[in-house]
Amino acid sequence: NQSKAKVDDLREHQRASYDIAESDKRLKCGKSAERGRIMAKKTRAERALKFETLQLHVGQEQPDPVTDARAVPIYQTSSYVFKNSEHAAARFNLSDAGNIYGRLTNPTEDVFEQRIAALEGGVAALAVASGAAAITYTFENLAQNGDHIVSAKNIYGGTYNLLAHTLPAYGITTTFVDPFNYEEVENAVKENTKAIFIETLGNPNSDVVDIEKIANIAHAHKIPLVIDNTFATPYLLRSFEHGADI
């Protein structure tokens, strides 16, 4: 019975993934509500699967239809073939969802992103070349000239330097706080604060921060809680389940 239940769960996940692929074209036409409904269905199906199953199958629920290969191939292409000029035009004006250029999308990266999102319990993911790039993308997306960030002071040195020295050159300032002093965290939030940032395990001391308490402060001010989960990984801790937003 347990084996049958696992098979049924995996099939449900496969059906949801197929529905998402079929709805990608309609998504570009404005039917995001349908995509959201299907994503919710897929997320529910993923939650029924164990962590080890997600590690192996998410993003490539069906083997390669041509070769029947189980493992995800490493696509090294930078370009893609279009059926004709109309097909290319549709891809580039985003009326037809699909691969355009390697700098934007890659089939291997797509599987990786889906798998990471599933393991973390998120709705989507973006693959980049390094953790530093991921954090930089995040802050540059949330804040701009004149904005402010609140960050735990017990964080990775590269991130500290980014916040303390690099981003100020772009007009983005940061207040560093003791993440265990919740009054200090609260008082550091300003009208122009765009996010609170912590690490699940502070680098290098492995401090264990109370994510839910920090999340409550962030959400009370209607700003996101950004978490670096490098040390813990989703195998040990899923930050979204404790209030993280990014």
Language-model features: locations:
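Conserved PLP-enzyme active-site core in the AAT-like
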Residues: 43-46, 63, 125-246
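Short conserved active-site loop signatures built around small residues
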Residues: 40-75
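Conserved N-terminal alpha-helix of the aminotransferase class I/II PLP-enzyme fold
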Residues: 84-133, 158-165
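Positively charged, low-complexity intrinsically disordered leader regions
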Residues: 67, 76-85
